[in-house]
């Protein structure tokens, strides 16, 4: 597999000097590039050596392993938190020095402000010494401001890097664990949960590291401020501090409540994402069943539960945010009320020193400290979830033993095993066999007999309860449901091996892929879409087989690879691949194709997990049983009684063929051929995820807000904000006005010596109390309203997006990897639920503060507007310059994140394959490469933000300096109150202004999530589900289907997969559809179901299918699909999602498909929750559930799409018999690779390259040696061909000449007098 991206720029930070590191100058070249053009992945800098995923993950893993050992020794539960602390405490502790200096500066700064105000209170125009001292204080104040500007951002940069390292290390460990999960552990988790750990839980680490230091800095700073306030205003300061002390436990209570709500939300989010994952995976089936509405309701209910919890936690957040803004006002009110009531007189210096000191401590105590608690409690929940996952059982690591003599061997003795220990009956019992090089061991048996389990035992996936499995040699494994990952066909076959042209060509030929690859646009460099979207089932199976053959292993485990292909290709694969290419190897073949058993060295027959018989083909024949007559009799008697091969629910928790079969996203791996093969390196590319460019349009904001509330409501919110802010400023202005009046009164008294004159305290206090109350009320109302509207918007847009996804054509799902679609539902919706409302509120509040600061400063010193103009111009230019780059960086961060999830999901789907090929290390490397690519983008995102913030704070520092020195220059015209108000407000601008601008950029960045969601609400739609023209109630009554010159393609620019198809299918006719893989068989079904709109006309009972709604059309046809899909939920919901049938009808349907006993054995019977994707059923049993669905629907038209490819002949016979019996009055179309299933059809349709080549009765086609159908039948071997011809002949005469009694000899292979190979297996059971 190729590296994720090739060219990497060295990281300029490594060579940057001190100044460049402090001011982030090393980023300047990147901003220049971003200014000129859009940034691409190649512009990102390589990740620093200490930030590499491999290095970080292995380091934390070492500490975790030590912790596990220590916990075991001390007999206690291991603590992941301990491992994290031991790994990172030193590097993180050093960063506390930054906090100490920064917070210390914040505390002393107000003292110098007080000295400047004192100068104005005692202003004497002739005292030049006092003036010079005041200039000194102004200079120190300015120095403090500059120190804060620099230190703050260095601290934030380093703590965010620490958070990133912890997150990356955790992801590495989670993925490593996922590759090692035992199968019992897989039963306890789901892809959705693991994806959620990787998408949501680990993100908490990015945030928690920012605030943790404030857990000690907060209380320390509070003590220092208390001392200074005591000196300044005496005992009254305790009243204000009492309010702070009350606030703290209140906020920690809110934090606890919040954390419990978050963990509940996480569980609901898990459930929603898991279900979304299944819905997106099974979308083709959902559309064919017309089940969209049922799933829309299911997701809507899950989302409703989730959003109610989110709203709760959002209101708590809103209260926390409001308390941050209101706290200062309440504290000042309480302090100065008690100060005045104790008989003191207010002065400007006391007011503004107290205000600034409280301001400093407020930021830490009411924002950073609670954030530390909130983020800490979130992180603890996440760590607990991750720890539980890391403690799941692992598969014991098994080395591939190569014996000293170099001979491979598989030796199984008295092997018994359980998938689920809770169940009484074992999955496999008492198995014994030996396989040596050059031997082909065939394993046969009915559905649920334990065939796949036997392979998993050899793989080491099924641990023994007793007995022994000894495997010497390297294993290659081909799973029953083929696993392919996104990448080229070639990279899927090479699977990390070096490309050797000659060997590769041989493998392609042996696996019958040559012709298929020629048909693909880019040959073997065609990119396979997600879940193999560009390949048919048979092609995927052969790519899987080719991967195994190319590995050149010693032992080959093949789980029914021949079922997915037609007879001709099956014969080719068996002869050229299994018998020739692998003739020196040990091959264990699970198969239902009995014609191949002759070639097997040994045959193993399983039933209910036990070995019924073992021996060679000849030994079975010599046992002297008259196979022919037995088979015939058994078939005739099988109808009334239950066939002995009744499938029982496989007694197990999981099998790989099923567990990850229907699951989440495949990866977007950019790998082709190995290095050094330039010619092979070129490859076709999967459509890239769209990244919108430039600014977020006004339209996105408009859609976002209007989704949350009506415009009247939004205008009301804007007014509420404005009025609230006016009262906020008025409260401070009133204090300053009061201090001025008091000061003027004191001066008058001093001049006149008149002490009786005093201010009316009740008047001043009354107004002050009123203003405080209004400010508090408006602050809380504003917070809650913003959260209400924005969470509501998220809910509305989620529903619109899901509705749009349900109505999107199937092509959309073929073109977009599941990871990409899921990313919108997990990550983007997560942002809109959680971070965006918070950031938005923060932005509104800080913006209003900044505006009021500037307004106050300008009102006091009007000429301040002069330097303000150039500063504003610099700011606007800087912001625009920054956003040009930052937008691209954020979008790169989004798009480099998807492959991480996709790779995880893909690996989980192919887990057994990866482990069989010992490819864990390679997959881990690839995962680390994806992580490093994401870290490159994330690192740029962090550093570019800091680059901007440092420059913004520099602008603010200049503003503070101008105000400080300006007020001294204009001392004659100003009073102490005005200077105090202007300077204290200017100081709050520090940090506040850059935070406001950063939050505005952050809002814009997060609006990308809104934009991505809105993009999915406007997807191209398929035709409407219901139209005005409705078919008559009983339609279709006859089931006549007419194809009139039908052309079909899946996309407008795609090739035609059906060409000029014209055919008539009469009422109640049974039509078999055959053809090579990729001939257009499944496309014929797609055209019938209008999965894409066909050209030409298709009529059903004289109604043109394109004129009616899709649901009216699809509900009236039943389909048993190629890949059976079950969804999480109850069996009842899987059979009847709309509750249209009674229990009696459901049980009857289950009984007819012989699943009744199996379902009755389940703990909750029909209401038992199925495992994810129904994975506690074997593939054959899931197929039977699909048959039960068809029986319940009772439609006139039934379509069977290779439904019996994965089942044994007994179950196949059962399905065929049920179809004949239950659907005798229906029109049935059957796509089949097994010709015996359709030989008794009324007609056979032979397709080749999308054209209808032959269409007639089977016997008529078999009379023509030139016909394609005749050639297909002959390829099965003489005996099988004779048996099929005989059956076709009987059916033909029975149908056309019913009066003639037609007898035929027993089904014999006349050339040698032996019964057909088809019979062996049936009698053996």
From Swiss-Prot:
Broadest EC class assigned to this enzyme: translocase
Gene disruption: observed consequences: Homozygous null mice are viable and fertile and exhibit any overt phenotype under normal conditions. However deficient mice show impaired anion transport in the blood-brain and blood-cerebrospinal fluid barriers and kidney. Deficient mice show an accumulation of the anticancer agent topotecan in brain and cerebrospinal fluid (CSF). In addition, penetration of PMEA, an antiviral agent, into the brain is increased in deficient mice.
Cellular component annotations (GO), alphabetically ordered: apical plasma membrane; basolateral plasma membrane; Golgi apparatus; membrane; nucleolus; plasma membrane; platelet dense granule membrane
Keywords: ATP-binding, Cell membrane, Lipid transport, Membrane, Nucleotide-binding, Phosphoprotein, Translocase, Transmembrane, Transmembrane helix, Transport
Biased composition (Polar residues): 657-667
Chain's role: ATP-dependent transporter of the ATP-binding cassette (ABC) family that actively extrudes physiological compounds and xenobiotics from cells. Transports a range of endogenous molecules that have a key role in cellular communication and signaling, including cyclic nucleotides such as cyclic AMP (cAMP) and cyclic GMP (cGMP), bile acids, steroid conjugates, urate, and prostaglandins. Also mediates the ATP-dependent efflux of glutathione conjugates such as leukotriene C4 (LTC4) and leukotriene B4 (LTB4).
Quaternary organization: Interacts (via PDZ-binding motif) with SNX27 (via PDZ domain); this interaction accelerates MRP4 internalization.
Name of protein: ATP-binding cassette sub-family C member 4
Lineage: Eukaryota, Metazoa, Chordata, Craniata, Vertebrata
């Amino acid at each position: 597999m190729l590296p994720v991206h090739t060219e990497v720029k060295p990281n300029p930070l490594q060579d940057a000097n001190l100044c460049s590191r402090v001011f982030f100058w090393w980023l300047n070249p990147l901003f220049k590039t971003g200014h000129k053009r859009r940034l691409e992945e190649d512009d990102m800098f390589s990740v620093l050596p200490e930030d590499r995923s491999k290095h970080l993950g292995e380091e934390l893993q070492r500490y975790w392993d030590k912790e596990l050992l220590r916990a075991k020794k001390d007999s206690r539960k291991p603590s992941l938190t301990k491992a994290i602390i031991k790994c990172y405490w030193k590097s993180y502790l050093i960063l506390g020095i930054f906090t100490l200096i920064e917070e210390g500066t914040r505390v002393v700064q107000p003292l110098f402000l007080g000295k400047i105000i004192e100068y104005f209170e005692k202003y004497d125009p002739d005292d030049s010494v006092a003036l010079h001292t005041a200039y000194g204080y102004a200079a120190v104040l300015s120095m403090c401001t500059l120190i804060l500007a620099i230190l703050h951002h260095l601290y934030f940069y380093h703590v965010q890097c620490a958070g990133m390292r912890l997150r990356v290390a955790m992801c590495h460990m989670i993925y490593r664990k996922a590759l090692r999960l035992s199968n019992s552990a897989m039963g306890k988790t789901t892809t959705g949960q693991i994806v959620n750990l990787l998408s949501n839980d680990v993100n908490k680490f990015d945030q928690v590291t920012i605030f943790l230091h404030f857990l000690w800095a907060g209380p320390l700073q509070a003590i220092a401020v208390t001392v200074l306030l005591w000196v300044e205003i005496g005992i009254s300061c305790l009243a204000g501090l009492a309010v702070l002390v009350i606030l703290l436990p209140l906020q920690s209570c809110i934090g606890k409540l919040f954390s419990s709500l978050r963990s509940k939300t996480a569980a609901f989010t898990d459930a929603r994402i898991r279900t979304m994952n299944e819905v997106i995976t099974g979308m083709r089936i959902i559309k064919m069943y017309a089940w969209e509405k049922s799933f829309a309701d299911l997701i809507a209910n899950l989302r409703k539960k989730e959003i109610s919890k989110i709203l709760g936690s959002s209101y708590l957040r809103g209260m926390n945010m409001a308390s941050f803004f209101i706290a200062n006002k309440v504290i000042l009110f309480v302090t100065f009320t008690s100060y005045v009531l104790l008989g003191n007189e207010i002065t400007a210096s006391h007011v503004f020193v107290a205000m600034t000191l409280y301001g400093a401590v407020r930021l830490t105590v009411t924002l950073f400290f609670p954030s530390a608690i909130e983020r800490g409690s979130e992180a603890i929940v996440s760590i607990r979830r991750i720890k539980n996952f890391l403690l799941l059982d692992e598969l014991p690591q098994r080395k591939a033993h190569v014996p000293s003599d170099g001979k491979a061997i598989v030796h199984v003795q008295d092997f018994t095993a359980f998938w689920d220990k809770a169940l009484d009956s074992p999955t496999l019992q008492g198995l014994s066999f030996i396989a040596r090089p050059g031997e082909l061991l065939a394993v046969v048996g009915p559905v649920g007999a334990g065939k796949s389990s036997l392979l998993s035992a050899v793989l080491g996936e099924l641990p023994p309860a007793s007995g022994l499995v000894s495997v010497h040699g390297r294993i290659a494994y081909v799973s029953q449901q083929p696993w392919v990952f996104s990448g080229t066909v070639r990279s899927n076959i090479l699977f990390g091996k070096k490309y050797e042209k000659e060997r590769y060509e041989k493998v392609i030929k042996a696996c019958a892929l040559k012709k298929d690859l020629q048909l693909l646009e880019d040959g073997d460099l065609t990119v396979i879409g997600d879940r193999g979207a560009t390949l048919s089932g048979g092609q995927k199976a052969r790519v899987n087989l080719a991967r195994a053959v190319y590995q050149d292993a010693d032992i080959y485990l093949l789980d029914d690879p021949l079922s997915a292909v037609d007879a001709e290709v099956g014969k080719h694969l068996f002869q050229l691949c299994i018998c020739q290419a692998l003739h020196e190897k040990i091959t264990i073949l699970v198969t239902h194709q009995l014609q191949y058993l002759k070639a097997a060295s040994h045959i193993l027959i399983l039933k209910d997990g036990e070995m019924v018989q073992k021996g060679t083909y000849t030994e079975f024949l010599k046992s002297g049983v008259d196979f022919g007559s037995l088979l015939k009799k058994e078939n005739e008697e099988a109808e009334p009684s239950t066939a002995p091969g009744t499938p029982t629910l496989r007694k197990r928790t999981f099998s790989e063929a099923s567990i990850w079969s229907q699951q989440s996203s495949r990866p977007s791996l950019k790998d082709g051929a190995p290095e050094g093969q330039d010619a092979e390196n070129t490859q076709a590319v999967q459509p890239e995820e769209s990244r919108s460019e430039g600014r977020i349009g006004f339209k996105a904001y408009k859609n976002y807000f209007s989704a949350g509330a009506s415009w009247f409501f939004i205008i009301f919110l804007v007014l509420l904000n404005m009025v609230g802010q006016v009262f906020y400023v008025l409260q401070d202005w009133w204090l300053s006005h009061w201090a001025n009046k008091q000061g003027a009164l004191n001066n008058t008294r001093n001049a006149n010596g008149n002490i009786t004159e005093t201010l009316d305290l009740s008047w001043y206090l009354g107004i002050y109390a009123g203003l405080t109350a209004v400010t508090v009320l408006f602050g809380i109302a504003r917070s809650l309203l913003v959260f209400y509207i924005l969470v509501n918007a998220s809910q509305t847009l989620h529903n619109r997006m899901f509705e749009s996804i349900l109505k999107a054509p199937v092509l959309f799902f073929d073109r977009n990897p599941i990871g990409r679609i899921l990313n919108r539902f997990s990550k983007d919706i997560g942002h809109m639920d959680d971070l965006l409302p918070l950031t938005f509120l923060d932005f509104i509040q800080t913006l209003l503060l900044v505006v009021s600061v500037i307004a106050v400063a300008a009102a006091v010193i009007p000429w301040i507007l002069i330097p303000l103009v150039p500063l504003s111009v610099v700011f606007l230019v800087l912001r625009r310059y920054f956003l040009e780059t930052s937008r691209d960086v954020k979008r790169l961060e989004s798009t480099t994140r998807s492959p991480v999830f996709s790779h995880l999901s893909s690996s989980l789907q192919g887990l057994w394959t990866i482990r069989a090929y010992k490819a864990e290390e390679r997959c881990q490397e690839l995962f680390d490469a994806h992580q490093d690519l994401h870290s490159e983008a994330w690192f740029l995102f962090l550093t570019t933000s800091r680059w901007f913030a440092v420059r913004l704070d520099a602008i603010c520092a200049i503003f503070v300096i101008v105000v400080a020195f300006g007020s001294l220059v204009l001392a004659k015209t100003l009073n102490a109150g005005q200077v105090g108000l202007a300077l204290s407000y200017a100081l709050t601008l520090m940090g506040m202004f850059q935070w406001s601008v950063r939050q505005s950029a952050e809002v814009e960045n997060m609006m990308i999530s809104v934009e991505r969601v809105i993009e999915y609400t406007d997807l191209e739609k398929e035709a409407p589900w219901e139209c005005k023209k409705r078919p008559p109630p009983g339609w279709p009554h006859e089931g006549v289907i007419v194809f009139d010159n039908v052309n079909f393609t899946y996309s407008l620019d795609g090739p035609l997969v059906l060409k000029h198809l014209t055919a008539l299918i009469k009422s109640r006719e049974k039509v078999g559809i055959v053809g090579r893989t990729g001939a257009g068989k499944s496309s014929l079904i797609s055209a019938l179901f209008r999965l894409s709109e066909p050209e030409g006309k298709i009529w059903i009972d004289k109604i043109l299918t394109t004129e009616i709604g899709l649901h009216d059309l699809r509900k009236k046809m039943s389909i048993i699909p190629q890949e059976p899909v079950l969804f999480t939920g109850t069996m009842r919901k899987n059979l009847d999602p709309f509750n249209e049938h009674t229990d009696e009808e459901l049980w009857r349907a289950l009984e007819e498909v012989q699943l009744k006993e199996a379902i009755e054995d389940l703990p909750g019977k029909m209401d038992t929750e199925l495992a994810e994707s129904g994975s506690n059923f074997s593939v054959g049993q899931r197929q039977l559930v699909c048959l039960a669905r068809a029986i319940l629907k009772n439609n006139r038209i039934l379509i069977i799409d290779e439904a019996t490819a994965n089942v044994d002949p007994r179950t196949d016979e059962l399905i065929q018999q049920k179809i004949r019996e239950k659907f005798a009055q229906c029109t049935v179309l059957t796509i089949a690779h097994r010709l015996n299933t359709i030989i008794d059809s009324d007609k056979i349709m032979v397709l080749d390259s999308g054209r209808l080549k032959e269409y007639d009765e089977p016997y008529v086609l078999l009379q023509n040696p030139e016909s394609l159908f005749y050639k297909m039948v002959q390829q099965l071997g003489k005996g099988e061909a004779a048996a099929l011809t005989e059956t076709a002949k009987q059916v033909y005469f029975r149908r056309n000449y019913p009066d003639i009694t037609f007898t035929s000899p027993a089904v014999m292979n006349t050339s040698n007098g032996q019964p057909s190979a088809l019979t062996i297996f049936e009698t053996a059971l």
